[in-house]
């Protein structure tokens, strides 16, 4: 494994370190996903391992997908291809949270996009109290939606209304607010993160997410025929249309994805998310936003278009 290190302690706690080779930041890539799947399978099958702590070997915890790789595949990518692309990370996150062993995430710095989706798939999250250690799902600003579980885990974790606020704004959240909202379970000085995670594991916590417990239903979702829920959805659609018009599809897709997904068991909900993500990923709007906002900007800043001499 080039991008991940595994250290198994005599106490049964395994430390999984994210440390992408040849990169200054941990990002989601096909090779990284392969490493994660291999690590999860090894941890699941090793009876000596009783709990896992995920940490980062970089200054920050983890960002999202490599945007350059995403743009590179646009020209030939079909919705079917895009769905398959999203399901690779989705399946890895699902394998992590259902492997039968408690997983704590010790975030030493920012966790955005796919990095925060990984954290959401963990059973316990400890975040550095450094104000720069922000968390969030900024995909809407790229014309996309979180494509590996974010639209489903976030509202189940903190509630539909608060979850939608973060998903539709794409804003980053500082540690103190993240704790208040329930995005993380603890905040601590950076040198205490792993100790806090170990303390949690020492309580012998359950390794099952609440949404996987038989009979679970999110309190705020009692079906679209309930007047309050139907009204919230209708108001949300109107607000999105009023703010963004109909030429910017991501906010409306996020809204529909959340309302549809929260009425379903997690695995079916994740499939709904994947279909909406695939539609957006193959839409020219997202392609142009990513190219204009990030790729072209980075090239310009590096002087790619600057005349010689």
Regions found by a protein language model. Give the residues of each.
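Glycine-rich beta-to-alpha active-site loop
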Residues: 90, 95-142, 146
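Amphipathic alpha-helical segments at domain termini/boundaries
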Residues: 1-19, 24, 120-121, 161, ...
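Hydrophobic, secondary-structure "cap" segments at the distal end of domains
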Residues: 151-161
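Conserved CoA-thioester-binding segment of acyl-CoA-metabolizing enzymes
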Residues: 1-55, 91-94
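Glycine- (often His-adjacent) and acidic-residue-rich active-site loop
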Residues: 56-91, 111, 141-143
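Long amphipathic alpha-helix in the N-terminal Rossmann-like dinucleotide-binding domain
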Residues: 202, 278-287
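Hydrophobic/aromatic residues within transmembrane alpha-helices
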Residues: 54, 66, 118-119, 178
């Amino acid at each position: 494994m080039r991008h991940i290190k595994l250290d198994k302690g005599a106490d049964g706690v395994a430390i999984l370190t994210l440390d992408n080779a040849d990169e200054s930041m941990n990002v989601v890539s096909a090779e990284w996903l392969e490493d994660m799947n291999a690590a999860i399978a090894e941890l699941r099958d090793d009876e000596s391992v009783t709990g896992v702590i995920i940490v980062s070997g970089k200054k920050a915890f983890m960002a999202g997908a490599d945007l350059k790789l995403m743009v590179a595949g646009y020209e030939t990518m079909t919705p079917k291809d895009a769905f398959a692309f999203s399901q690779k990370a989705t399946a890895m996150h699902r394998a992590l949270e259902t492997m039968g062993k408690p997983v704590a995430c010790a975030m030493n710095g920012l966790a955005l996009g796919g990095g925060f989706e990984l954290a959401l798939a963990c059973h316990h999250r400890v975040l550095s109290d450094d104000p720069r250690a922000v968390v969030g799902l900024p995909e809407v600003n790229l014309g996309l939606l979180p494509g590996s579980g974010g639209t489903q885990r976030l509202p189940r974790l903190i509630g539909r209304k608060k979850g939608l606020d973060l998903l539709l704004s794409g804003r980053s959240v500082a540690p103190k607010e993240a704790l208040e909202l329930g995005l993380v379970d603890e905040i601590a000085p950076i040198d205490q993160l792993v100790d806090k995670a170990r303390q949690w594991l020492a309580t012998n916590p359950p390794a099952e997410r609440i949404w996987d417990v038989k009979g679970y239903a999110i309190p705020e979702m009692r079906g679209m025929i309930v007047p309050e829920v139907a009204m919230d959805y209708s108001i949300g659609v109107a607000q999105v249309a009023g703010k963004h018009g109909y030429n910017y599809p991501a906010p409306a897709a996020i809204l529909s994805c959340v309302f549809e997904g929260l009425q379903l068991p997690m695995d079916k909900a994740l499939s709904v998310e994947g279909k909406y993500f695939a539609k957006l990923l193959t839409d020219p709007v997202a392609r142009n936003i990513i190219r204009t906002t990030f790729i072209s900007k980075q090239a310009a800043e590096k002087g790619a278009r600057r005349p010689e001499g």
